Amino acid sequence: MRTIKVGSRRSKLAMTQTKWVINKLKELNPSYNFEIREIVTKGDRILDVTLSKVGGKGLFVKEIEQALLHQEIDMAVHSMKDMPAVLPEGLVIGCIPKREDPRDALISKGHQKLDGIKEGGIIGTSSLRRSAQILAERPDLTIKWIRGNIDTRLQKLETEDYDAIILAAAGLSRMGWKDDVVSEFLEPDRCLPAVGQGALAIECRESDEELLKLFAQFTDEYTQRTVAAERAFLHAMEGGCQVPIAGYASVNDRDEVELVGLVASPDGKTIYKETAAGHDPEEIGKRCAAMMSEKGAKALIDSVKQELDQDGK
């Protein structure tokens, strides 16, 4: 009987997600044993600067992927939005379970909604994507960077000068806190989610046929199709945490994958937004990226990256 070693970050949310996946896999095949290996990533260690300044995407997965490649673990559970567009050679996303709530959630003092927050109010987020879209709607607000796990950020809202913070609804839901703390859910037409937000990525070695066979029973086709379009868009735009980029796909009544892509300037003053639909998720993602690039989105991404490079020198 095989014991499957599962890599996970140490945070409460990461461990909750990993244990949920293990329980589901045990239901599918009770003959496997699972053992969790906690791994500390660079993103967990560096908490005093914004993600965009320390390398963006991959910060929460690189050490875990190294453990996979060195066969120290057999599989890993990640938040899909943390996954870079391109994986290391030899690794695959073996499974994408059914997506949780993809929306962003506003948690505020006094349970105020976004339009009720006072002029000049301070919003805490560590995401350029969120801050750009919030500033586009409410340019009078002040963005203040906030880092740390979900529980740390909720504590900072209470003890520091934030009027509100924005978190992924999925994380709050998985922790069982969504109903208690959320002041307002920000719908995708108002704040477009990050690529893959709300979905989990179960990563393993491409050569592990036994695990891939087990995972095949756990993959959600709807989530797989929509996330594939979003990730193709991210890859084509060459975006990461350094740039305000968003992508969210759904399946329309013609059974087509319909993707909305967005690229913004960090101040929210310039926003490019396009929609593409079709049956091939990869093609849709690339087409949406091409449409936006023609209008100037790619040039905006390059200029934002250049500014960040100069700031870091």
From Swiss-Prot:
**Which InterPro entries does the protein's record reference?**
HemC, Porphobilin_deaminase_cofac_BS, Porphobilin_deaminase_N, Porphobilinogen_deaminase_C, Porphobilinogen_deaminase_C_sf
Annotated catalysed reactions: 4 porphobilinogen + H2O = hydroxymethylbilane + 4 NH4(+)
Q: Which cofactor does it need?
A: dipyrromethane
Q: Which CDD domains match?
A: PBP2_EcHMBS_like
What's noted on cofactor binding? Binds 1 dipyrromethane group covalently.
Keywords, sorted A to Z = Porphyrin biosynthesis, Transferase
Of the GO CC terms on this record, one is: cytoplasm
Could you tell me which pathway this protein works in? Answer: Porphyrin-containing compound metabolism; protoporphyrin-IX biosynthesis; coproporphyrinogen-III from 5-aminolevulinate: step 2/4
UniProt cross-references to HAMAP family, sorted A to Z? Porphobil_deam
Any additional notes? The porphobilinogen subunits are added to the dipyrromethane group.
Family classification = Belongs to the HMBS family.
Its annotated function is as follows: Tetrapolymerization of the monopyrrole PBG into the hydroxymethylbilane pre-uroporphyrinogen in several discrete steps.
Protein's recorded name: Porphobilinogen deaminase
